[in-house]
Amino acid sequence: MSKPEIRALRMKMGFVFQGYNLFRNMTALQNVMEGLTTARKIPEAEAKKRAREVLDKVGMSDRENFYPDQLSGGQQQRVAIARAIAYNPEVILFDEPTSALDPEMVGEVLEIMKELAESGMTMIVVTHEMGFAKNVATRVMFIDEKVIMEENEPQEFFAHPKNARLREFLSKVN
């Protein structure tokens, strides 16, 4: 792929990192606006309006003027999700979005992700949250040592795993 093709593809994707990757010197609102104004060249007033809409969607409208160090891990991850959905991507990639969270915060982030899935958002999620995968995913893959060991619909994947390594894994996490 050429560099312009790669850039065009990236413009269709959102990405939520496990470590949030928020700019520490920017408020929640500014963090969401940054990609809109810098990469998308959206006028500031329009970017601010859109940023406020998505912060509201993830339950963070009351924290728009807070800096990352003033937010809990779950709140930071919700800002990261707002940033990812701000420009209406075709797909969002989630890299273990709950792994850096306190157990109490995991549920609120998973609930937002579930709402995104229910709204029709295509998501590729790397996760160890098997209950979430079982209840929300339309396809589940088990990858071990960089190899796809099994792929199936959630019910079949969890009820009748064909791969021995997957059966071993599921026996340890269930």
Outline where the language-model segments fall.
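C-terminal boundary and immediately downstream tail of ABC-type ATPase nucleotide-binding domains
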Residues: 144-145, 151, 155-174
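ABC family nucleotide-binding domain
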Residues: 1-154
